[in-house]
């Protein structure tokens, strides 16, 4: 396991140097040279890299008290844009319910009787009141219920998320656990804490917390540009949509274990449970009691 601390190789999504179409270099030389034998095939593998990224730790007063490191698996720069784009499209597609439905002319009510005679009226011929040309008639090529979900491999989906997080480290920092500082819900206190940390309440900020304490959640839910996420609700869209990322020491440890180079491959059950939670809207619970074991 080799790591590099060079800052020149760090990913930067917000600088648009990695994901901007202008940064892609096109060469007239072939990317892949096929061997002379027509039976052998050569494929380009997605080489995964790792980089040790330092992040400052701030206390509740906004003072720097230490430093921690984020060590995530990331796609190489020449392939990162495609991997993140594919992960984003998959996330947005799988959120679609696909329940839109319209009635065709064969499904609308009525229309069995000819409205008026074919001839001798001076009007255009009309065969059915359910024609799409008439008000209340059917819809031509309207939407019908369908499944919009598309498949993306687990490893690639996790790589897209870790690459997006690593690309935003230039606008990220770590704060100490601050839930005990909110004895009661108060939005004014949360905004004051954000300003001490150097955050502008007008900018989109994402707080990644291990647990969502009630006082913290109620203090921040009135801030339109603020997003509070937990490991169960962490998703690629909110990471890319945020201008600032704020972590806690617990979430940094979670990310290094979950998306880092030492990630265990036998965590399928836990991964499926958390990824199912990502499809549920943030903060929405169905209230259904869990079945007794």
UniProtKB/Swiss-Prot annotation:
GO terms for biological process: DNA-templated transcription termination; translation. Residues 263-293 have a biased composition (Acidic residues). Component of the chloroplast ribosome (chloro-ribosome), a dedicated translation machinery responsible for the synthesis of chloroplast genome-encoded proteins, including proteins of the transcription and translation machinery and components of the photosynthetic apparatus. Keywords: Chloroplast, Plastid, Ribonucleoprotein, Ribosomal protein, RNA-binding, rRNA-binding, Transcription, Transcription regulation, Transcription termination, Transit peptide. Its main location: plastid. The lineage of its organism: Eukaryota, Viridiplantae, Streptophyta, Embryophyta, Tracheophyta. The gene is RPL4. This protein (expressed without the transit peptide) is able to provoke transcription termination from the spinach chloroplast rDNA operon and the E.coli S10 operon in vitro. Belongs to the universal ribosomal protein uL4 family. SUPFAM superfamilies: Ribosomal protein L4 (SSF52166). This is Large ribosomal subunit protein uL4c. It comes from the Eukaryota. Residues 1-50 form a transit peptide. Residues 107-138, 259-293 are annotated as: Disordered. One of its GO terms (molecular function) is structural constituent of ribosome.
């Amino acid at each position: 396991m080799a790591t590099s601390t060079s800052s020149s190789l760090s990913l930067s999504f917000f600088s648009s140097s990695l994901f901007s179409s202008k940064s892609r270099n096109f060469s007239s030389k072939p990317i892949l040279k096929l061997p002379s034998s027509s039976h052998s095939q050569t494929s380009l593998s997605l080489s995964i890299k790792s980089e040790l990224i330092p992040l400052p730790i701030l206390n509740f007063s906004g003072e720097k008290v230490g430093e921690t490191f984020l060590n995530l698996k990331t796609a190489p720069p020449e392939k990162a844009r495609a991997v993140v784009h594919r992960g984003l499209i998959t996330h947005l597609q799988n959120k679609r319910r696909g329940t839109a439905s319209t009635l065709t002319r064969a499904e609308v009510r009525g229309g069995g009787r000819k409205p008026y005679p074919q001839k001798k009226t001076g009007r255009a011929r009309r065969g059915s009141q359910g024609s799409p040309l008439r008000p209340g008639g059917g819809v031509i090529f309207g939407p019908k219920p369908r499944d919009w979900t598309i498949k993306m491999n687990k490893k690639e989906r996790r790589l897209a998320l870790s690459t997006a997080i690593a690309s935003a480290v230039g606008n990220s920092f770590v704060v100490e656990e601050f839930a005990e500082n909110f004895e009661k819900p108060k939005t004014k206190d949360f905004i004051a804490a954000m300003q001490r940390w150097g955050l502008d309440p007008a900018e989109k900020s994402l707080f990644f917390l291990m647990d969502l304490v009630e006082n913290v959640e109620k203090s921040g839910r009135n801030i339109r540009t603020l997003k509070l996420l937990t490991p169960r609700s962490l998703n690629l869209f909110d990471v890319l949509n945020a201008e600032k990322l704020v972590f806690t020491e617990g979430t940094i440890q979670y990310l290094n274990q979950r998306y880092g180079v030492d990630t265990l491959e036998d965590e399928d059950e836990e991964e499926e449970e958390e990824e199912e939670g990502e499809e549920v809207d943030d903060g929405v619970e169905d209230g259904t009691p869990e079945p007794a074991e």
